[in-house]
Amino acid sequence: DNCRCERRIFVDYSGRLVIADKAWSDNPATVVHQNFMLSPQMRLVEREENVLIFEGNRYGLIISQFVAANCVVEHGLTEPIVSGWCSVNWREKEKTYQVTFSQEGSGLHFLTKFQVFEKEKGIAKTWALESPSPEVMARLAL
């Protein structure tokens, strides 16, 4: 398949991260994946439709997907094989979570938001459900 991809990343003043991925293909049966791998210390604590909440010992992470996409959360050995920090191969040492969003078609896009939070302070799920502002959407060219 003749396939092209583009990624735009926006970080706002409060440290929230928005990733917009676009993909174009000549074949409408093309499946495109957006993958994220989390550290072994993170564990899935809540899943509601398009919102995933992970927590570690001190911090947590909210992942929100705003474009209809299949979502698979896997826990275990990661593919592709990745080495961790230094010379340790984390794939052999500890299992991780891998989040995969996927879509099928010839003109696809993903809109994913991330928010790191301190567990002591709790989380604001309302933010997870809010669409990015028109200014952010314009900067991401969506």
Positions of PLM-derived features:
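CBM-like, beta-strand-rich accessory domains located in the C-terminal region of large
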Residues: D1-L142
